[in-house]
Design a protein with these regions (language model features):
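Conserved sequence signature across two-component system core domains
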Residues: 11-12, 39, 58
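Conserved binding/recognition cores within well-folded domains
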Residues: 118-173
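Two-component/phosphorelay signaling modules centered on CheY-like receiver
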Residues: 2-3, 15-37, 78
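Conserved Asp/Asn-Gly motif in the active-site loop of CheY-like receiver
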Residues: 36-44
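CheY-like receiver
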Residues: 44-129
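Non-catalytic signal-transmission and effector/linker regions of two-component phosphorelay proteins
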Residues: 1-9
Length: 173
């Protein structure tokens, strides 16, 4: 568990709710490397998402501002099928909308700690199950690197340097 890394976005127009959810995520993250970002609106998230699309888990409120969480999730699903989407809202009438975006789960506020921790465990399991990996042969070892961990590649002559979230590996071409 200690080498698991996740990038999680919390999108909620209620700052108190976003902070509460972030606290629960931090509890879940005790044995993991987790980067948490919070956004006050779907628009704020989408503005950032244009530059930073590597989120693993999205915890989304549904009713917020001009763009709702379901519309935002539909836009994200157009180019990211693997991100795990969890709706967290006070409105049960939107449950059916979650199926349109293949949401992992739908939690009703106020969220119970155990519920969210279980859903995050399920999201992590799904991410691992669907994960694509590269087999990299370095000078002294062969390692497996999950594709989602790769940030960029650097090529110089006969060597490729693979820059990951937490690791750098040099591979001969």
């Amino acid at each position: 568990m200690a080498n698991e890394t996740y990038k999680i976005a919390i999108c909620d127009d209620s700052q108190a709710d976003a902070e509460y959810i972030a606290t629960l995520v931090k509890e879940w993250a005790k044995d993991r490397i987790v980067k948490i970002r919070t956004y006050p609106s779907a628009e704020a998230f989408m503005f950032n998402y244009a530059e930073e699309k590597d989120f693993d888990i999205l915890l989304l409120d549904i009713e917020m501002g001009k763009m709702d969480g379901v519309t935002m999730a539909k836009a994200i699903r157009q180019d990211n099928e693997s991100v795990q989407i969890v709706f967290i809202t006070g409105y049960s009438e939107y449950i059916a909308d979650g199926y349109d975006v293949a949401a992992l789960h739908y939690l009703i506020k106020p969220v119970k700690t155990e519920q969210l921790l279980n859903v995050l465990d399920r999201a992590a399991e799904r991410l691992k199950k669907n994960e694509k990996e590269l087999l990299l042969k370095t000078a002294d070892e062969t390692v497996v690197m999950p594709v989602r961990e790769i940030r960029y590649l650097d090529v110089q002559q006969n060597y490729v340097t693979v820059h990951g979230k937490t690791d750098v590996k040099v591979v001969k071409r």
